[in-house]
């Protein structure tokens, strides 16, 4: 599929990238200002229903990761770009030894301050290189909504390949952007522009096929890809189109949370099969690839 947009170019592996790409210094300055001015997406609080939603999604993805590991025992968990620390908290409760890295401690201090001692702040690539140099290995690495933010997604996945232990798993979640569905929305006039292009926050844009391609090129075997609730289906209906009418955003989010919690009443394996089918046809606002190191 061809996407003609002057802001993006197609990488040889199929994903879309910002064009031109900011320099590392420009990006560092941007995020320094971003956190200093409290412009991040972190909320001051979440409802009990939202916390249950976070836990439900973590439980589903953890179930699939554990099925691939096949050990049934907790191990070492690394969350790269751990944000507010909800994954760290969930896995610690499940008995794992947890570590997190992030550009800032703002999120973890706001939502899970008791886990701040498990988190190191700084440049993600530098922190990963330090762990590689120390021959650290992890049984499960979590990379949620991070790959799209970095200048060098190929280099990031290559580094993580050196940190996952034999038999371990890397779970990579990215927005499902540049999809055939999004182009259909634009072509039919449901959206006025490619709303999903969010520069300089998002520098790379992935679909199921391009996520699989970059994984394969960086030493990983892709075992499974699942989607999540396809909230952008609301954009085909005038009464719920949250791009044209921002006032619809909160109700769309509530519907997503309620539907996800309803699904969470079913066995995680069944829910994951449902979301794998959605991903296979290009749907799901986010997609998660479960990767194992190639021998």
Features from the language model and the residues they span:
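Conserved N-terminal segment of class I S-adenosyl-L-methionine
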Residues: 1-144, 153-157, 227, 240, ...
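A structural micro-motif
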Residues: 96, 117, 168, 220-221
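S-adenosyl-L-methionine-dependent methyltransferase catalytic module, highlighting the catalytic core
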Residues: 151-162, 169-294
